[in-house]
Curated annotation (Swiss-Prot):
InterPro entries tied to this protein: OPA3-like
Function summary: May play some role in mitochondrial processes.
Protein name per UniProt: Optic atrophy 3 protein
Disease listed for this protein: 3-methylglutaconic aciduria 3: An autosomal recessive metabolic disorder that causes a neuro-ophthalmologic syndrome consisting of early-onset bilateral optic atrophy, spasticity, extrapyramidal dysfunction and cognitive deficit. Urinary excretion of 3-methylglutaconic acid and 3-methylglutaric acid is increased. MGCA3 can be distinguished from MGCA1 by the absence of increase of 3-hydroxyisovaleric acid levels. Optic atrophy 3: A condition that features progressive visual loss in association with optic atrophy. Atrophy of the optic disk indicates a deficiency in the number of nerve fibers which arise in the retina and converge to form the optic disk, optic nerve, optic chiasm and optic tracts. OPA3 is associated with cataract and a neurologic disorder characterized by extrapyramidal signs and ataxia.
């Protein structure tokens, strides 16, 4: 069962975005009913939006200097409530994007730190291996060559033979390896 690969955060963000639409509808209803919301939150942005929209349309059609009448209070309240609802959905969606970006950045940072730690561990191990190699090379250099060891063995056998057979000379001694 693959639990770690399941995109739980993305599913959570999708759920939040789905909940934002009913939330926006509730905010719109509250804005329509409340005088405070109508007067101070819905009407000014709605009138500004209406003024910019009408002015842009008039300029596109070639009319200059025409006076734009403001919306009546009911239409402005309706437009303001719609703008507030859309802004709520947009803010929730943007917030989800920002949170996903931060989460992704944190994952990337964590991944880079793990890679950096792995590289450092490999560097340390290579350093230890280099020191061990140098020590082994020094031991090999300090050890007598193989030919010298063979000569020492033959001499040792000759000395043993002389000690065991005091009457025989060193030239007649038979090495122990040939017996």
């Amino acid at each position: 069962m693959v639990v770690g690969a399941f995109p739980m955060a993305k599913l959570l963000y999708l759920g939040i975005r789905q909940v934002s639409k009913p939330l926006a509808n509730r905010i719109k209803e509250a804005a329509r009913r409340s005088e405070f919301f109508k007067t101070y939150i819905c009407l000014p942005p709605a009138q500004l939006y209406h003024w910019v929209e009408m002015r842009t349309k008039m300029r596109i059609m070639g009319f200059r200097g025409t006076v734009i009448k403001p919306l009546n209070e009911e239409a402005a309240a309706e437009l303001g409530a719609e703008l507030l609802g859309e802004a709520t959905i947009f803010i929730v969606g943007g917030g989800c994007l920002v949170l996903e970006y931060w989460r992704h950045q944190a994952q990337q940072r964590h991944k880079e730190e793990e890679q950096r730690a792995a590289w450092n561990a490999l560097r340390d191990e290579v350093g230890h291996l280099a020191l061990a190699l140098e020590a082994l090379q020094a031991q090999v250099q300090a050890a007598p060559p193989q030919g010298a060891l063979e000569e020492l063995r033959t001499e040792l056998q000759e000395v043993r033979a002389q000690l065991c057979n005091p009457g025989r000379s060193a030239s007649h001694a038979v090495p122990a390896s040939k017996k």
